[in-house]
């Protein structure tokens, strides 16, 4: 394997089995290069970060940098996507997809700071993440070389990885038994593999690790008031909070009531279908709040355009094109639409369901006077006939032509 002149590599490091093995592998296969470990704190389980620096150094890294990206992740990545209403294939709230560009960006920033020649990730050759990481690298620092061990090495099993570390006397807490593959951040937890590999198998209870089983959730519903400004959640139950703190608060409430579970089969960018169980408790509550205000504020054409924005944005984000001009254009349009998306929504949480039971906005286009079925001074029922005749004119002309040509 050629060194390609690489002297220093910054690795996106998680502390897991794969990236722990990547550190010595890089040093052995890239001419004894220096490996700097980069750990992104995006709200994953705190225990995943305990001792991660020591673990990286024991694996052979020269340095380990743990960077707190939690607030930036929610403020600059999650909230902008929420403004567009993006849902990949109608249900996936893009938890992993949104996290990859901020990780890769911070990794590139560290690489430039320490004078690295290359960046490295631990994504497999079958998944979407390799595309998301490398597209970001290319957009931000095209001169950096990219190393993707899963496309090069012959370590194809957990057993092989464990043996590799054992042979080099590198300690690890990993074991042979790893039933599921999981990704976790402040926004969501995804679970894949194991029993989920067959779409005919119902998820086991251990497929869900964050949210309470809706059937076992509290028997009494709970209400929460969400304040929205410019399409962003800014307060929970009247308390103004930062984006990350808003999400953190709603995650606790949502998980308690079994909110935010989905079990889907999705189309990966690389052409493979995959199944996953996703848990997004706080995010699901936020989406419900935003929809509640949008229903009051956006007119029909604006709402339709926001739906189209969300559809396009879902593919852009899923495909890892965060730093593409198209994403910025979609975002600018969404921000313009969100200017008047201000208001309050009271949501009821009950056994996995989120229901908007009260909503108000100073910019509301809803008028009780117009909405009534009774008589009023501003809407003349007789006007509807002319509108319908014009609205259906093309259908009328087509029908007349068909009769004429019979």
UniProtKB/Swiss-Prot annotation:
E.C. numbers: 6.3.4.5
Localisation per UniProt entry: Cytoplasm
Enzyme class: ligase
Binding residues annotated for ATP, in chain numbering: 12-20, 40, 122
Chief site of localization: cytoplasm
Binding site for L-citrulline: 92, 97, 128, 132, 181, 190, 266, 278
PROSITE patterns: ARGININOSUCCIN_SYN_1, ARGININOSUCCIN_SYN_2
Sequence similarity: Belongs to the argininosuccinate synthase family. Type 1 subfamily.
Subunit structure: Homotetramer.
PANTHER family, sorted: ARGININOSUCCINATE SYNTHASE
Protein name: Argininosuccinate synthase
């Amino acid at each position: 394997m050629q060194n390609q002149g690489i002297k220093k590599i910054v690795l996106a490091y998680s502390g897991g089995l794969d990236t722990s093995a990547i550190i010595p592998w890089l040093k052995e296969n890239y001419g004894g290069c220096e490996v700097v470990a980069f750990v992104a704190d995006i709200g994953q389980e705190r225990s995943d970060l305990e001792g991660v620096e020591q673990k990286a150094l024991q694996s052979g890294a020269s340095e380990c940098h743990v960077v707190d990206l939690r607030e930036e992740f929610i403020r600059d990545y999650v909230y902008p996507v929420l403004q567009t209403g993006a849902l990949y294939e109608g249900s996936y709230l893009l938890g992993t997809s949104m996290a990859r560009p901020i990780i890769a960006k911070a990794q590139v920033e560290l690489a430039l700071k320490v004078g690295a020649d290359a960046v490295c990730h631990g994504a497999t050759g079958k998944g979407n993440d390799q595309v998301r990481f490398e597209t970001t690298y290319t957009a931000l620092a095209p001169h950096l070389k990219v190393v993707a061990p899963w496309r090069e090495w012959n370590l194809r099993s957990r057993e092989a990885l464990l043996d590799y570390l054992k042979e080099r006397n590198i300690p690890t807490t990993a074991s042979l038994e790893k039933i599921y593959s999981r990704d976790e951040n402040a926004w969501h937890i995804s679970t894949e593999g194991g029993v989920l590999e067959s779409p005919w198998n119902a998820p086991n209870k251990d497929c869900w690790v964050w949210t309470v089983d809706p059937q076992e959730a509290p028997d009494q519903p709970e209400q929460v008031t969400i304040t929205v400004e410019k399409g962003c959640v800014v307060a929970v139950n009247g308390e103004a909070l930062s984006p990350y703190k808003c999400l953190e608060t709603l995650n606790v409430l949502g998980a308690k009531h079994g909110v935010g579970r989905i079990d889907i089969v999705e189309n990966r960018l690389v052409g493979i279908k995959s199944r996953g169980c996703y848990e997004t408790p706080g995010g699901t509550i936020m989406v419900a709040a935003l929809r509640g205000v949008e229903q009051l504020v956006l007119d029909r054409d604006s709402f339709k355009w926001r739906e189209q924005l969300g559809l396009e944005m879902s593919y852009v984000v899923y495909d890892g094109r965060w730093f593409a001009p198209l994403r910025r254009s979609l975002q600018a349009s969404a921000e313009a639409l969100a200017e008047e998306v201000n208001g309050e929504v009271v949501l009821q949480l009950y056994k996995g369901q989120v229901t908007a039971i009260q909503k108000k906005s100073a910019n509301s286009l809803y008028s009780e006077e117009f909405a009534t079925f009774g008589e009023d001074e501003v809407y003349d029922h007789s006007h509807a006939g002319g509108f319908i005749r014009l609205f259906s004119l093309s259908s009328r002309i087509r029908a007349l032509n068909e009769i004429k040509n019979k």
